[in-house]
């Protein structure tokens, strides 16, 4: 392991050394390039169709896909069948000469390969035996089918609801297998989280969240058909959905929680050290060891803490750092009195950002998003916010734990120019393969989200020292994750040790701190992706500014990153260095609405 120096240069050099070379940007003969591209396209289109088939989706003659009519099969036999199929795809992918592919197809191949390798990682450790954590689960969001427009789509949704007992039973059987070998979510992160199940156990079907889509149906569906669909939905919710959730609740409380592992560290599970290192690679898409990441985290924590102390001085606060944190956590001026007040602050930040984004990004998405509260069933144990293609969620649960000085950074990250913005641009890349539009890598996506918080400084979003401290507190939060995640899973930190570290370095509330730490404990490796992704993007920008000098323009630089879409960070590094070598000329054509030039 190379020696690590706790300086920004060391952090940069560690990250800079991780990208393997992708084939040189030299076009092969046209015939070879066409043949290799066709072979690659056949592979990823076959995988797309196979993925659709797992949900009963079929491609119609017009090229459109039918709606899903079932949940995927997750039993061990289906999992092994899937792994055999993935290994076969990898063998075929290996047989395609990389040098024969076009520059665009080399990116497609890198993304496709990484997707397949991640599937093999999950298979190697039988990840299906632990299908949830304190943040995400297989039983949530099934009640949100998206926009249903036709009777066929409603019938497909009803069919999926009818399939819920089978789907849950397979997951429960897998979880029993995991319990038997000590592969489970830690018990301490399970306590009190059954509300995400009990909220779906209602006295009537009409009161159930699964029925929400039927309350107001499109007028293009005849009234008689609407009545039939509502009656069928009510019957299925009563006969299939509610009983499935009752079975799940009994299993969760009486079987899973009492038998879940008491050790926190991933290293203490079967083949635990190898498992943790695999999760690090999967979520960061970098070849860094846990120890290297721990040292990067310590370096970043020290750097950010110095900036936080300067910002405290800018605010004119007289007292110690701990006293300043106490002031921020307890003074009423920093907290909303109603959920609507918090939502309005977020919406106001989003609109202010709208007026500035065009100065930094050239191609803007056509799709709009809305800002909504996190659903009540999830809010108590959910993160502060969550960005999505159609909506950006803000958590309004326990308002005394949601300081308003954090909302500007949170809104930029989750809404625009962060997740909702980036996802919309990815969706609008109509010329690329379908699998690219729906691929998500945490290192890229979360790295971009955290980077946009930093862009808020250039955009003039942070108007007070407190809002800037909120930004720094959020950056510190992500840097501390590098220390805590590796501390828990490789070094054996206790939950209390992790809580004390996060609380002592950020202005996060106690509720947020505990929720976050439980997330890191139950979801090894995922939290590392944010800071490592952001460091990669900021380092690439520094390289571009140094190489291009006065010719550097942030708009095409950011357009190039966003037009590329979600890719492994190693691929992003290679691609953006090609962009720099071309003098800042686009390698990928950006799509979207072109923002007017601004000075």
Mark where each language-model region is.
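Positively charged n-region of N-terminal signal peptides that target proteins for export
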Residues: 1-4
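Bacterial N-terminal signal peptides
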Residues: 7-16
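Signal peptide processing junction and immediate N-terminal pro/mature segment
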Residues: 15-25
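N-terminal maturation segment of proteins
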Residues: 23-599
């Amino acid at each position: 392991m190379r020696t690590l120096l706790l300086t920004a240069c060391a952090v940069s050099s560690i990250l800079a050394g991780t990208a393997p070379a992708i084939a040189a940007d030299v076009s092969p003969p046209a015939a070879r390039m066409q043949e290799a591209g066709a072979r690659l396209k056949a592979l990823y289109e076959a995988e797309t169709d196979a993925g659709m088939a797992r949900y009963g989706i079929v491609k119609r003659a017009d090229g459109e896909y039918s709606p899903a009519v079932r949940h995927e099969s997750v039993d061990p036999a289906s999992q092994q069948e899937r792994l055999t199929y993935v290994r076969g795809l990898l063998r075929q992918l290996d047989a395609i000469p990389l040098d024969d592919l076009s520059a665009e197809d080399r990116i497609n191949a890198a993304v496709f390969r990484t997707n397949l390798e991640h599937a093999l990682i999950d298979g190697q450790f039988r990840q299906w035996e632990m299908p949830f954590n304190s943040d995400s689960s297989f039983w949530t969001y099934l009640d949100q089918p998206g926009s249903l427009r036709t009777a066929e789509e409603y019938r497909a949704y009803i069919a999926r609801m009818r399939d819920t007992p089978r789907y849950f039973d397979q997951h429960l059987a897998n979880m029993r297998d995991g319990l038997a070998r000590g592969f489970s979510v830690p018990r301490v992160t399970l306590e009190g989280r059954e509300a995400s199940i009990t909220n779906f156990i209602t006295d009537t079907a009409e009161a159930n969240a699964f029925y929400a889509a039927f309350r107001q149906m499109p007028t293009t569906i005849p009234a008689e058909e609407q009545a039939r669909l509502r009656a069928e939905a009510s019957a299925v919710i009563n006969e299939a959905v509610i009983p499935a959730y009752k079975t799940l609740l009994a299993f969760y409380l009486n079987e899973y929680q009492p038998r879940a592992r008491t050790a926190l560290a991933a290293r203490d599970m079967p083949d635990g050290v190898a498992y943790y290192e695999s999760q690090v690679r999967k979520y960061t898409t970098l070849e860094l060891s846990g120890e290297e990441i721990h040292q990067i985290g310590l370096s970043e924590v020290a750097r950010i803490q110095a900036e936080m102390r300067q910002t405290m001085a800018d605010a004119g606060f007289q007292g110690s750092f701990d006293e300043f944190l106490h002031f921020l956590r307890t003074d009423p001026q920093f907290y909303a009195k109603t959920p609507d007040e918090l939502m309005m602050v977020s919406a106001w930040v989003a609109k202010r950002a709208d007026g500035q984004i065009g100065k930094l990004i050239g191609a803007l998405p056509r799709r709009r998003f809305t800002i909504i509260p996190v659903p009540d069933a999830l809010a108590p144990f959910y993160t502060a916010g969550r960005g999505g293609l159609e909506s950006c969620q803000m958590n309004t649960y326990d308002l005394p734990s949601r300081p308003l000085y954090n909302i500007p950074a949170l809104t930029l990250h989750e809404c625009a120019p962060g997740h909702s913005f980036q996802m919309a641009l990815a969706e609008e890349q109509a010329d690329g393969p379908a699998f690219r539009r729906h691929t998500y890598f945490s290192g890229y996506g979360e790295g971009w989200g955290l980077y946009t918080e930093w862009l808020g400084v250039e955009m003039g979003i942070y108007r007070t020292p407190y809002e800037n401290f909120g930004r720094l507190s959020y950056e510190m939060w992500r840097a501390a994750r590098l220390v805590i995640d590796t501390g828990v899973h490789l070094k054996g930190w206790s939950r209390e040790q992790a809580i004390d570290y996060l609380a002592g370095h950020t202005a996060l509330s106690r509720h947020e701190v505990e929720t976050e730490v439980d997330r890191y404990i139950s979801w090894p490796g995922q939290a590392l992706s944010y800071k490592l992704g952001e460091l990669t993007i900021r380092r690439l920008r520094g390289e571009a500014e140094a190489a291009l000098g006065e010719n550097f323009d942030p708009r095409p630089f950011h357009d190039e990153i966003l037009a590329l879409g979600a890719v492994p960070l190693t691929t992003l590094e290679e691609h953006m260095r090609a962009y720099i070598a071309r003098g800042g000329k686009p390698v990928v054509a950006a799509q979207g609405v072109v923002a007017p030039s601004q000075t």
